[in-house]
Every structure is written in structure tokens, then in C-alpha cells.
């Protein structure tokens, strides 16, 4: 993320992004990351790779929210108020070498408030314009969270690594 900071800042300003959810930040505890007019909440991995962050415009009232009980999933969460009601917003990442555990996903959902999750679970499914479905992708489609899930993964244009910000997998409950 550090090497693409100017590109990210340009994208956020050009598209008037108030809350930006990031995965695979590749930041570690000793590295500072700041953008003008933004507050950065992040979860770094102790080893190389991974990591998540949420950039929030300073004018947006919000709180950092802990997510206890995560085993393999890396996630950063905030709480904002929209239309007078609280909503939890998460950025999450799961390494391809880590197993997808239902308890990790369940820990992200708060039964008391709506949740929006944008994540990179290294999962593929044909419903998401992928040419194949993986076991993780199949699990995500039928994810047993015990709560209604609206999946917004369908992206009209082909997915490419050249446009990583067009690869979200947001879930809301």
C-alpha cells in the first residue's frame, strides 16, 4: 500500500470516498501510514503480507470496534451512524494458506446492529463473474451466519489485477 499511496489518495479524492476499506495492505507495526484529512484504522500482520485498513474522512463521526475471537481472518472494524442507526463496517482478509472458519465470519456479525463487510477471502464463484467456483466461494454463497445476508459481489465488468478496487466482496446483514 505504501508504494501506491499517491494513487490511492488520488482515487479517494477523485471519487469523493468517505470510507475506504482495504485488504492486503502489507503494512507492519513499525510503518506509519497517513493520508490527508483521513483517520486510518488498521490491523497489521506480524509477518509479511496481509493486513487490513479502513480510511475514514475526519469529518465522519465513527468509533473503532474490536472483533474478538478471530482465528485466521484479519479484520478491521468501525461503527458509524447512518439515518440515526449504528452500522458496523469491516474490511477483512483471509490468506490463501489459511482455512476459512465459519466462527471467524460469525464473529464479524453483530446480532444487534447491521454489518457491512468488504473482504478478500481468496474465494471464487461463478456468480461473481469468475470462470470457476472454489470451495471457499461455495461456502460464502451459502454462508450460515444465522442472519440474513445480502451479497453484492456481482461486478459487471471483468475482474483484473490492474483495477484492484473493483474486486470487493461486500456483505451486509
Task: Enumerate the predicted regions with their spans.
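A shared catalytic/ligand-binding motif for oxyanion handling
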Residues: 1-173
Amino acid at each position: 500500500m505504501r508504494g501506491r499511496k499517491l494513487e490511492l489518495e488520488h482515487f479517494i479524492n477523485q471519487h469523493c470516498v468517505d470510507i475506504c476499506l482495504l485488504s492486503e495492505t502489507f503494512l507492519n507495526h513499525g510503518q506509519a501510514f497517513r493520508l490527508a484529512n483521513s483517520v486510518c484504522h488498521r490491523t497489521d500482520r506480524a509477518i509479511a503480507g496481509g493486513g487490513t485498513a479502513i480510511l475514514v474522512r475526519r469529518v465522519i463521526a465513527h468509533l473503532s470496534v474490536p472483533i474478538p475471537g478471530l482465528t485466521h481472518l484479519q479484520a478491521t472494524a468501525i461503527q458509524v451512524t447512518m439515518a440515526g442507526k449504528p452500522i458496523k463496517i469491516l474490511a477483512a482478509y483471509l490468506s490463501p494458506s489459511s482455512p476459512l472458519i465459519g466462527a471467524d465470519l460469525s464473529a464479524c456479525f453483530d446480532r444487534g446492529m447491521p454489518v457491512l463487510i468488504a473482504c478478500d477471502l481468496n474465494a471464487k464463484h461463478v456468480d461473481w463473474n469468475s470462470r470457476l467456483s472454489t470451495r471457499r466461494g461455495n461456502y460464502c454463497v451459502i454462508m450460515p451466519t444465522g442472519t440474513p445476508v445480502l451479497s453484492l459481489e456481482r461486478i459487471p465488468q471483468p475482474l483484473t489485477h490492474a483495477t484492484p478496487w473493483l474486486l470487493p466482496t461486500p456483505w451486509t446483514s
